[in-house]
Regions:
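Acidic glycine-/aspartate-rich tracts in secreted/extracellular proteins
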Residues: 1-3, 23-27, 39-41, 63-67, ...
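A structural motif detector for short, solvent-exposed N-terminal "entry" segments of globular domains
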Residues: 1-39, 77-81, 99-104, 134-144, ...
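Solvent-exposed beta-edge/loop recognition patches
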Residues: 2-16, 41-120, 248-254
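Beta-strand signatures of extracellular beta-sandwich domains
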Residues: 19, 34-36, 84-86, 168-172, ...
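Short, compositionally stereotyped local motifs that mark structural "simplifiers"
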Residues: 51-54, 60, 104-249, 263-264, ...
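Middle-to-C-terminal accessory/interaction subdomains
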Residues: 98, 118-122, 128-139, 229-232, ...
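Conserved NTP-binding catalytic cores of kinases and kinase-like/nucleotidyltransferase enzymes
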Residues: 149-151, 161-163, 215-344
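Internal "kinase-insert"/substrate-recognition segments embedded within catalytic cores
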Residues: 299-331, 350-354, 369-487, 495, ...
């Protein structure tokens, strides 16, 4: 159940595996029998036709892939922390063989040995062959704790117990050392300050048991009275100064932390540090961001870990289970919401954008109690761009996927500021520097395939018949996604758009999709360069062709242009309607009013110019608060000023883009069921005269 390198399946994955053995002297067929990991669901996974000769063994992968041809794969995985496994007879009820297995150790198999069928572990797994001694040299049981991890306001006495007679409990409270001091437990441990207790069982002649830990976060005076209408995140780094390790040019390792994530109460609508957490547990954390790592208010990468320091998929704030997260810090974005607005509109439009929640963060790095001094402000807790069924849902590329058709996907790649760890390549025709996101370490064959595929795309795009509907560029890209991405960048005038922060994915046998959106904090006027603060003007005209991938040629196709503007006006009647956009901002503002006051008490930046805040443009009248001079960051002295300025900018931007193309004809009535004959008038809403064409051929 913790196969890391023992056995690979046909996909080159080290999936969980189990072995079935016919110990009888006769041939049998297990077709119609069942395997299950749940005693409440005995008929969980039905075995296909499976003949076994006398004393024959067969391997089945517990990978959740549900395959009944070729190598067999169950529709469940095995729990590495211990669980139930059973073989059920064809009646779907009768148990033929079963046992409860304990917590597993990486690449140590667990099973039976000899005629006695004794259960235990094997240092040298033998899939497909008989189990061989020695067996049972590992302690698999875990120490029991009298208390779960929690916040404390006073002293707590922690009792440790062993489920195995004759074993010794050893524990440590050393979190950061690579060579911690282990003590023998003989009396309750008095917890008076923030402490993590890690314990294991030991016994002569056996390897130490698996680690288990509990963490207790001490709240300082007054913290029990904290209330917020946003979720709270409390992180303790065990005296490690995470902010002091920030660097724009390298990725520092994630440091051990403990995180507590508290959602708002469904009845009161508030969250408090003493509330039952939505999730609490071990993790790793570091400062993230190249430019933003230099800001006073840091943003962080956060990873959820198990007791061994390995990735652990969990659900936080109702998001699908994963281990990689981002705690984003709006800083120069004084609206606190630019990224969230873009991510949620993209998600609502059906793209795999990251999910987000506003929250408030407390980060304790000095080793004392968590106090008001540890308040870091309003943050956005969000997902990271990754391949999985709940984020970017594409096939996983394994190291053996080096031939057609498997080599054709799934890839995630980006045009962005590079890190030294990125695997990069350059397109030949337009010369774009791109980097792999998934797989992050592709095989040479995979790297060559994607590079060549994009070269073929560019050759076609710049060919004489590039606009052919089936053999032109449309054969390579999902046109709608490229149009929507262009609209997002231009509508919000994202100064990192096109040239940076541009992500693409390609699933197996599918076209390239321009998505997900990423990093829009320098949008909606929040940039004093490349004309970013002005709501008029196309952003792409500020860029060189190398910074504007593929669109120069795409817009030479009249059909692409027509499709683009049809999409624009379609969105203007829905999600990008001016009233809908203003309502979205107002809803977020109402939720953020009180937290924003606390944020700007912590970070006294209102009325100050932070790079790259807009300095010149001001909203025209009539707008809420338009009697105030909102030009220049120094004149925007309140949170309301920042919101009004952004709303004014967005309104002007929507209006300006509308003027760049004739508006579509207006119908005198909506579609629907009619009785009898109905008249329909079609009129031209534009000031310029023109001919209206229509069709009734749907």
């Amino acid at each position: 159940a913790q196969n890391e390198s023992t056995l690979e399946d046909e996909d080159c994955r080290t999936s969980d595996w189990l072995e079935l053995f016919n110990s009888t002297a006769n041939s049998i067929n297990l077709g119609g029998w069942y395997l299950t990991d749940d005693p409440e669901e005995p008929a969980k996974w039905r075995l296909p036709d499976l003949p076994l000769d006398a004393n024959e063994r067969t391997i089945i992968f517990a990978s959740n892939q549900d395959r009944t041809e070729g190598e067999l794969h169950t529709d469940f995985r095995l729990n590495r922390n211990g669980g139930y496994l059973a073989l059920i007879q064809p009646d779907g009820v009768t148990v033929a063989s079963s046992y409860l297995y304990p917590s597993q150790i990486a690449d140590i198999s667990y099973g039976t040995l000899g005629l006695e069928q004794s259960q235990g572990s094997f240092r040298n797994p033998t899939p497909g062959d008989p189990n061989v001694a020695p067996q049972g040299t590992y302690l698999l049981e875990k120490v029991a704790f009298s208390h779960e991890s929690q916040v404390i306001t006073g002293q707590l006495n922690l009792t440790l117990t062993t489920p195995v007679p004759g074993t010794t409990i050893r524990y440590t409270t050393d979190v950061t050392s690579s060579n911690p001091t282990w003590r023998t437990y003989n009396r309750p441990i008095s917890i008076r300050e923030t402490t993590r207790v890690t314990a294991r069982l030991e016994q002569a002649g056996k390897e130490p048991g698996p680690l288990r830990d509990r963490t207790f976060i001490k709240l300082g005076s007054g913290m029990e009275n904290v209330r917020s209408n946003l979720p709270l995140i409390i992180v303790d780094s065990f005296r490690r100064n995470l902010d002091g390790e920030s660097s724009a040019n390298s990725q520092n390792p994630k440091r051990p932390v403990h995180g507590i994530f508290i959602d708002v109460d469904s009845d009161s609508g508030l969250a408090s540090p003493t509330d039952l957490p939505d999730f609490e547990g071990r993790g790793g954390m570091r400062v993230r961001g190249q430019t933003s790592s230099g800001f006073a208010k840091k943003q962080y990468s956060f990873e959820t870990w198990d007791s061994e320091g390995e990735d652990k998929d969990v659900s936080i704030f109702g998001f699908p289970e994963e281990s990689d997260w981002v705690i984003h810090a709006p800083y120069s974005d004084k609206s606190l919401m630019r990224n969230k607005i873009v991510y949620e509109t993209s998600l609502e439009m059906g793209y795999p954008a990251v999910r987000t929640r506003f929250c408030e963060l407390y980060l304790n790095t000095n080793g004392g109690d968590v106090s008001a001094a540890d308040y870091r402000g309003v943050y956005v807790f969000m997902e990271k761009i990754k391949r999985n069924s709940d984020r970017v849902n594409i096939k996983q590329l394994e190291k053996c996927d080096n031939d057609q058709p498997s080599i054709t996907g799934g890839y995630i790649f980006k045009k962005d500021k590079g890190q030294s760890v990125d695997v990069t390549f350059n397109t030949k025709r337009e010369g774009h520097s791109l980097a792999f996101v998934e797989p992050d370490q592709p095989t040479q064959a995979q790297k060559t395939w994607l590079d060549s595929h994009l070269d073929r795309f560019e050759d076609t795009l710049w060919g004489s018949r590039f606009d052919h509907p089936t053999r032109g560029y449309r054969n390579f890209i999902d046109v709608k996604s490229f149009i929507d991405t262009h609209i997002w960048v231009e509508l919000y005038k994202n100064i990192d758009g096109y040239r940076l922060s541009s992500y693409f994915y390609k699933d197996r046998g599918r076209k390239i999709v321009a998505s997900p959106v990423w990093d829009y904090n320098l949008s909606l006027g929040n940039a004093d360069y490349l004309q970013g603060e002005f709501p008029n003007g196309w952003y792409y005209t500020q860029l060189s062709s190398n910074a504007y991938p593929w669109y120069n040629r795409l817009f030479l196709d009249p059909e692409f242009v027509i499709q683009y503007w049809d999409r624009w006006f379609e969105l203007r009647e829905g999600i990008f309607d001016t009233g809908a956009m203003m309502a979205r901002i107002d809803n977020h503002t109402a939720k953020l009013n009180a937290p924003a006051r606390r944020n700007f008490q912590r970070w006294r930046i209102l009325g100050n110019h932070l790079w790259p805040n807009a300095q010149v443009w001001t909203p025209p009248s009539p707008l809420p608060g338009s009697d105030r001079n909102l030009a220049g960051a120094r004149n925007r002295r309140s949170y309301r000023d920042e919101i009004d300025w952004m709303k004014g900018w967005l309104t002007a931007r929507l209006d300006w883009i509308d003027t760049q193309r004739d508006n579509p004809p207006v119908f005198s009535r909506d579609g629907g069921i009619i009785s009898g004959v109905a008249s329909l008038l079609i009129s031209n809403p534009n000031t310029r005269r023109g001919q209206i064409y229509y069709t009734t051929d749907g």
